[in-house]
């Protein structure tokens, strides 16, 4: 009978991938990123271990949404104080902090526990085409 092999933390190999968000649809891009962050693209995927890779996203300000979402999609946040609800449209958030749009979309697709928070830390999102991770030799992710 075959035994299921659980990878140890020492044997997990982490690669660096580069994703260009230019002219990509937000949700479709986020699902591919979340899959790589979780490690579901690897044969050694284990649900309770962080087997995923690092992902660098560039050109975050050029990500697209379909339909009227650019003018109608709302992002809500709350300061925790009474009356502290802030609501912002996709367009204004894309001008102000485009990295947050991709981060929030991917974060919602990861597990909502300590493992998901650990996997989310391996996501690096940048406005523009430059990133400080050239030393890691990131491989372009086919998407």
From Swiss-Prot:
Q: Extract the coiled-coil ranges from the record.
A: none
Q: Which domain of life is it from?
A: Bacteria
Keywords on record: Ribonucleoprotein, Ribosomal protein
State whether keyword Ribosomal protein applies. yes
Pfam families, sorted: Ribosomal_L13
Q: Name one GO biological process term.
A: negative regulation of translation
GO cellular component terms attached to this protein's record? cytosolic large ribosomal subunit
A GO term, aspect molecular function:
structural constituent of ribosome
Tell me which InterPro entries the record gives.
Ribosomal_uL13, Ribosomal_uL13_bac-type, Ribosomal_uL13_CS, Ribosomal_uL13_sf
Could you describe the subunit structure of this protein?
A: Part of the 50S ribosomal subunit.
Instruction: Tell me which family the UniProt entry assigns to this protein.
Output: Belongs to the universal ribosomal protein uL13 family.
What does the protein in this record do?
A: This protein is one of the early assembly proteins of the 50S ribosomal subunit, although it is not seen to bind rRNA by itself. It is important during the early stages of 50S assembly.
Stated name of the protein: Large ribosomal subunit protein uL13
Organism lineage: Bacteria, Bacillati, Cyanobacteriota, Cyanophyceae, Synechococcales
């Amino acid at each position: 009978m075959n035994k299921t092999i659980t990878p140890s933390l020492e044997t997990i190999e982490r690669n660096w991938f580069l994703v260009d968000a230019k002219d990509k649809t937000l949700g479709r891009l986020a699902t591919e990123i979340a899959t790589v962050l979780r490690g579901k693209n690897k044969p050694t995927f284990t649900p309770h271990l962080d087997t995923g890779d690092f992902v660098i996203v560039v050109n975050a300000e050029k990500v697209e949404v379909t339909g009227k979402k650019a003018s109608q999609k709302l992002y809500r946040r709350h300061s925790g104080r009474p009356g502290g609800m802030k609501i912002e449209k996709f367009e204004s958030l894309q001008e102000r902090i485009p990295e947050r749009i991709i981060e929030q979309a991917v974060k919602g697709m990861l597990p909502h526990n300590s493992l998901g928070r650990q996997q989310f830390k391996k996501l690096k999102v940048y406005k523009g085409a430059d990133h400080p991770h050239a030393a890691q030799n990131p491989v372009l992710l086919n998407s």
